[in-house]
Amino acid sequence: MGRRRGVELYRAPFPLYALRIDPKTGLLIAAGGGGAAKTGIKNGVHFLQLEQISGCLSASLLHSHDTETRATMNLALAGDILAAGQDAQCQLLRFQIHQQKGSKAEKSGSKEQGPRQRKGAAPAEKKSGAEVHPEGVELKVKNLEAVQTDFSTEPLQKVVCFNHDNTLLATGGSDGHVRVWKVPSLEKVLEFKAHEGEIGDLALGPDGKLVTVGWDFKASVWQKDQLVTQLQWQENGPTSSNTPYRYQACRFGQVPDQPGGLRLFTVQIPHKRLRQPPPCYLTAWDSSTFLPLQTRSCGHEVISCLTVSESGTFLGLGTVTGSVAIYIAFSLQRLYYVKEAHGIVVTDVTFLPEKGCGPKLLGPHETALFSVAVDSRCQLHLLPSRRSVPVWLLLLLCVGLIIVTILLLQSAFPGFL
């Protein structure tokens, strides 16, 4: 078997920090930029159309939305609404895609997996907020409400996520406060101090519970603004108290084949860089008791981001050294790994959705993970379907083994039967 490697699907003209996929339209949305510094590097949100062409997954730029002087550092998706973290504010965007009548889709395309530019595509930035391509696909992006979500001395929104029914979104940032907002009005409905120092990540469960992790070494579970419990990993974990760890990321995920079942997954990384770096850890938690169920080492590369597949079957990890890995959620065993796929910090990872356009785009593979990094590249990581022996074949082999055993006994002992 050859060395695994990711496929470069798209290269943007700016560093990429956030990534989402719309299951309904098959749009891959990648965002980033160079920030406010006058370096000539633009800031934007790129909408890419994912397609299967000659059995290979391909991405082509459909629309580029200019975000002026603000780089998008984090994204959340709810239907046709994007919540984009840009500096100290959260900007809501609404995108609409529809096919123009009387146009034919482009049938030809490269057989190679990788970036594809549509014929005659207009320049990336459009002040009108809409682009129409020869294929007749039109995409419009509209700025909705925006609100400041962080108020520290150097304000920065670090994370944003929607609740299960997309009526609320929660934000966290450098000032350690969680703020919850109505969608789409962005009217603030809740605010509380969750951590001393910045919030690293947060996750909203379907029962309204909120999990936050911060640079103060704490991971807390909240019901509205009331502290329910704090995760106790290092007290019961595999590490010594001499090595301080902090929680880097948290995500809720479904339990496959258990309707309504839920798990919480967290990543723990060493707080300090040592000459001989200690391992990072991946932990699964019971979502009702918030007790650890299982912990495994996930290597000595520092983990930068975590995602969970739609069904809760797989976990995706990115590292600060550019590596990408896929783990199976129930056992926390690694199935796929590409060392230094990007060569620089992986800023976000996301799985291809398992509903909507996902199965059609996935083809014969078991899952697909997308990764973006500061190197401006979006990579595709495909996990081949694991071969399994059919039950009927196992039964046939058992019957054959019994018959052979009987024949051997009969030949060795003629009066045996």
UniProtKB/Swiss-Prot annotation:
Interacts with SAR1B (GDP-bound form). Interacts with MIA2; recruits PREB to endoplasmic reticulum exit sites. Interacts with CIDEB; facilitating loading of SCAP-SREBP into COPII vesicles. It is a single-pass membrane protein. The keyword Transmembrane helix applies. Residues 103-115, 124-135 have a biased composition (Basic and acidic residues). InterPro entries: Quinoprotein_ADH-like_sf, Sec12-like, WD40/YVTN_repeat-like_dom_sf, WD40_rpt. The modification 3'-nitrotyrosine is found at Y10. GO terms for biological process: COPII vesicle coating; endoplasmic reticulum to Golgi vesicle-mediated transport; positive regulation of transcription by RNA polymerase II; protein transport; regulation of COPII vesicle coating. Guanine nucleotide exchange factor (GEF) that regulates the assembly of the coat protein complex II/COPII in endoplasmic reticulum (ER) to Golgi vesicle-mediated transport. Selectively activates SAR1A and SAR1B by promoting the exchange of guanosine diphosphate (GDP) for guanosine triphosphate (GTP) in these small GTPases. Was first identified based on its probable role in the regulation of pituitary gene transcription. Binds to the prolactin gene (PRL) promoter and seems to activate transcription. Pfam families: WD40. Residues 410-417 are lumenal. It comes from the Eukaryota. One of its GO terms (cellular component) is endoplasmic reticulum exit site. Keywords: Activator, DNA-binding, Endoplasmic reticulum, ER-Golgi transport, Membrane, Nitration, Nucleus, Protein transport, Repeat, Transcription, Transcription regulation, Transmembrane, Transmembrane helix, Transport, WD repeat. The gene is Preb. It is found in: Endoplasmic reticulum membrane; Nucleus. One of its GO terms (molecular function) is RNA polymerase II cis-regulatory region sequence-specific DNA binding. WD repeats lie at residues 152-191, 194-232, 298-337. This is Guanine nucleotide-exchange factor SEC12. Residues 1-388 are cytoplasmic. Residues 101-135 are annotated as: Disordered. The chain crosses the membrane at residues 389-409.
